[in-house]
A protein has these predicted regions:
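Short, hydrophobic/aromatic-enriched beta-strand segments in well-ordered soluble domains
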Residues: 29-31, 35, 48-50, 124, ...
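N-terminal, polar/Ser/Thr-rich
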Residues: 1-26, 174
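Beta-strand-rich interaction surfaces with strong enrichment in secreted/lumenal proteins
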Residues: 3, 14-17, 109-111, 123-128, ...
Length: 240
């Protein structure tokens, strides 16, 4: 980068609650967006990666048939595996994708927002000028996908034979919260539809995340553990 290089900064404070019985995550995130660019911004773009699993997503509607196809002059039928059929039925029957319950600024003013596939545009009440920052709040929830059915990057797996009544679950969360699209000096907004593969550029920032989970769960994440005495047994602390 040259001497006039700049990069936006986005800080997140997220409070999330995991409902194991319904496999649903609900959360509130507070976002501080610092405009380090020379441009005045009137809207912000967010990524809603979980919308990729909706049955009406571009990824699903543009996907090609991946079963076995006979030659064009053959009378044999095309075939689809039971696993593929199960995945299609699961997406059709399930209410997947991010549900945005509210978007507001620091003064609790509701902000107009438009969801387009795996993207969401939030319109600002006032222009965000160079050097200024804005605080936003987003309330959201989504049903975590069944990893055994869709083989996603993150999801849940059920262990019905666990000693706990009704079995037990393990959850792996990825691409789970609405996050700012990168705004760059070479492209502007990098607001491209997520089709299920590839990686995205993200802005630098600080994260403060709290998770409320059932008492028999252990939360594992990157970062430095702040309260081991409150959340881990002595044996577990000794293993660290």
């Amino acid at each position: 980068p040259g001497h006039e290089y700049w990069q936006q900064e986005v800080d997140y404070t997220i409070d999330a609650v995991l409902d194991e019985e319904s496999q649903r995550l609900s959360a509130t995130e507070m976002i501080t967006y610092q405009n380090n660019s020379p441009d005045t911004l009137t809207y912000l773009w967010f990524q809603l990666d979980q919308n990729r699993f909706r049955s009406d997503s571009i990824a699903e509607l543009s996907g090609t048939f991946n079963g076995s196809s006979p030659d064009a002059d053959s009378n044999d039928p095309a075939r689809i595996s039971l696993a593929q059929l199960r995945a299609l039925q699961y997406q059709s029957d399930s209410d997947l994708g991010h549900r945005i319950n509210a978007v507001s600024d620091s003064r609790e003013n509701a902000l107009a927002h438009t969801v387009v596939g795996t993207l969401m545009r939030v319109d600002l009440l006032e222009p965000l000028r160079p050097g200024d920052d804005i605080e936003l709040r987003i309330d959201f929830e989504y049903y975590i996908v069944n990893g055994d059915v869709l083989s996603p990057r993150g999801g849940y797996e059920h262990f019905p034979d666990d000693e706990r009544d009704g079995g037990n679950y393990i959850f792996a969360l990825s691409q789970w919260f609405p996050r700012l699209v990168a705004y760059t000096d070479y492209e502007g907004w990098t607001n491209k539809e997520f089709l299920g593969s590839g990686e995205f550029t993200l802005e630098f920032g600080d994260y403060a995340v709290s998770m409320t989970v059932p008492a028999d769960h252990i939360v594992s994440a990157t970062g430095e553990l702040q309260n081991p005495g409150e959340v881990l047994t002595r044996d577990q602390r000794n293993r660290l």
